[in-house]
């Protein structure tokens, strides 16, 4: 069996060379990290759940005409994706005050914001991913003004879709993080949604109880992370009651 070439390894995922030109295999790890990896733990089953949830969301986004890098899920831990040039920005869309926004602006957690707020963070672990403005982004050439417009338009569309999706299953979308990349198709380039969208990258609260169904359970030592992710998957209709993720190692694509 030939080992695939590892292209990149991040905190929660590994990218391998894909079976066809222009493709990659995205592997979801069980690693849970917080505070820029200062807190780290391996939680069995987390990667399987994130793979399934992100697959479901990206499939729906593709279906309604929001372009993404997602092609298809390969197995319990891996997806086939289009190779894109990642823009070094984390795009955060906030609907409710929580996390750093509540802390920095002195807002009570759970306060509904006057409107959705889009923030940009420069992807640099050594700098703790600092918040940046559109001025920084264009001055340093991370993205052009037109690309920023495209990214913001995508962020608004994704937020509208996710808000409705989760509202329909009794979950409030507090905020979420997404990444974008440049997808080259011949001489044409377009901005697409990349990375993942899962409880690792979104704050999800039960509408009735305000129970946290996301990675804040790990950040705040609340426990029950896998159970919370399972509940999200169950409500989305992508995992049965008895379909519990089992620990497993990397699965190679033959």
Swiss-Prot record:
InterPro entries given in the database record: SAICAR_synt/ADE2_N, SAICAR_synt_PurC, SAICAR_synth, SAICAR_synthetase, SAICAR_synthetase_CS
Keywords, ordered alphabetically: ATP-binding, Ligase, Nucleotide-binding, Purine biosynthesis
Catalytic reactions of this protein: 5-amino-1-(5-phospho-D-ribosyl)imidazole-4-carboxylate + L-aspartate + ATP = (2S)-2-[5-amino-1-(5-phospho-beta-D-ribosyl)imidazole-4-carboxamido]succinate + ADP + phosphate + 2 H(+)
Gene Ontology molecular functions: ATP binding; phosphoribosylaminoimidazolesuccinocarboxamide synthase activity
GO cellular component, one term: cytosol
HAMAP family registered for this protein in UniProt: SAICAR_synth (MF_00137)
Protein name, UniProt field: Phosphoribosylaminoimidazole-succinocarboxamide synthase
Lineage: Bacteria, Pseudomonadati, Pseudomonadota, Alphaproteobacteria, Hyphomicrobiales
Originating gene: purC
């Amino acid at each position: 069996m030939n080992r695939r070439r590892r292209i990149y390894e991040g905190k929660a995922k590994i990218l391998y060379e894909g079976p066809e030109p222009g493709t990659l295999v995205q592997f979801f790890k069980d690693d849970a990290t917080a505070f820029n990896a200062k807190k780290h733990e391996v939680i069995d089953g987390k990667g399987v759940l994130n793979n399934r949830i992100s697959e479901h969301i990206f499939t729906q986004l593709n279906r309604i005409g929001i372009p993404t890098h997602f092609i298809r899920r390969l197995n319990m831990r891996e997806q086939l994706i289009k190779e894109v040039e990642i823009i070094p920005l984390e795009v955060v869309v906030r609907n409710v005050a929580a996390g750093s926004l509540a802390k920095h602006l002195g807002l009570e957690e759970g306060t509904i914001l006057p409107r959705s707020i889009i923030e940009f963070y420069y992807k640099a672990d050594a700098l703790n991913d600092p918040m940046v403005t559109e001025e920084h982004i264009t001055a340093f050439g991370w993205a052009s003004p037109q690309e920023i417009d495209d990214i913001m338009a995508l962020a608004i569309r994704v937020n509208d879709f996710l808000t409705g999706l989760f509202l329909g299953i009794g979950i409030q979308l507090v905020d979420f993080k997404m990444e974008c990349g440049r997808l080259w198709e011949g001489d044409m380039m377009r901005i697409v949604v990349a990375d993942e969208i899962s409880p690792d990258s979104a704050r999800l609260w039960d509408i009735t109880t305000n129970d946290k169904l996301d990675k804040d359970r790990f950040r705040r030592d609340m426990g029950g992370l896998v159970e919370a992710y399972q509940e999200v998957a169950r409500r989305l209709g992508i995992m049965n009651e008895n379909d519990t993720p089992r620990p497993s190692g990397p699965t190679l694509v033959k």
